[in-house]
Design a protein with these regions (language model features):
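Active-site anion-handling motifs in enzyme catalytic cores
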Residues: 1-261
Length: 261
């Protein structure tokens, strides 16, 4: 039997180190991080009755009281021994990373042109709260191109390459919806305009069913159902079919533009 102490942010509701009662334990295992400083050294006084082991740690100063207080130190790197692979690699190998979807996320609080029909601030909270409960790897999506900012794509090709690597896009923005479908990636779109605005219109133009109106954003069952559908084989096929379908309306617009020049 063992207990694992977590950061309160990483595992809300889990056991925190400050809450662990030292008298209940025979051993203390400190995993990962540098064995250095007062916080680590304080463990030796708190858990004085336990056999204390440090594993997968960095040892900077072997004479540091934080180090010498352990009964056994199994370092990942130290001047006294060759480096070994970090324990995190073993945790990754034991999990199934392919089962966790990568989700591009693009929300907006702008679009003042919609005036009193705007519900942008009202829909963002429910979306982000709902997303926080999803086991996914979220990726913020920004279509603004800037060759001077390493955090942004410098070319349209780079942004489309990013989109193509996603499993799903969650968005309240027209261009993220359109570009996701153009890349064959399912999109869960929420229209932040009461009664429907340009996001709803774009979904209709693509014949795309993955849309939630602003009035239903608090319906987590609807969000969950669309999330599951987007990540299903059916949802992926629908997005790929939308991407491959010829757009005669767009061609008509381009022809009209050329004719008007």
């Amino acid at each position: 039997m063992h207990d694992t102490a977590w950061s309160e942010v990483f595992r809300p509701g889990g056991l925190r180190l400050e809450e662990a009662r030292p008298g209940r334990y025979s051993h203390l295992v400190f995993v990962c991080g540098p064995v250095h400083g007062e916080q680590v050294a304080g463990l030796h006084g708190t858990f004085v009755g336990c056999r204390r082991i440090a594993v997968g740690v960095t040892v900077i100063d072997p004479a540091d009281p934080a180090v010498t207080g352990f009964d056994l130190v199994l370092a990942r790197d130290s001047d006294a021994c060759p480096p070994v692979r970090d324990l995190a690699a073993a945790a990754v190998a034991a999990s199934a990373p392919a089962a966790v979807p990568v989700a591009g996320v693009a929300l907006t609080t702008g679009q003042g042109e919609y005036g009193l029909r705007r519900r942008h601030e009202l829909v963002t909270g429910p979306i982000t709260g709902w997303l926080g409960g999803k086991n996914c790897a979220p990726v913020p999506l920004e279509t603004r191109l800037d060759s001077r900012d390493w955090r942004l794509c410098a070319t349209a090709e780079a942004f489309m390459a990013l989109l193509a690597r996603l499993d799903i896009v969650v968005t309240t923005r027209l261009h993220r919806l359109a570009l996701a479908l153009a890349a064959g990636v399912p999109a869960l779109a929420v229209d932040p305009v009461a009664g429907g605005g340009k996001v709803s219109a774009q979904a209709r133009a693509w014949g795309w069913p993955g849309l939630v109106p602003a009035e239903r954003v608090a319906d987590t069952a609807r969000l969950d159902a669309l999330w599951d559908w987007c990540l299903s084989a059916e949802g992926r096929r629908a997005a790929q079919a939308a991407s491959a379908r010829p757009d005669h309306d767009m061609q008509a617009v381009l022809d009209a533009l050329v004719g008007g020049l």
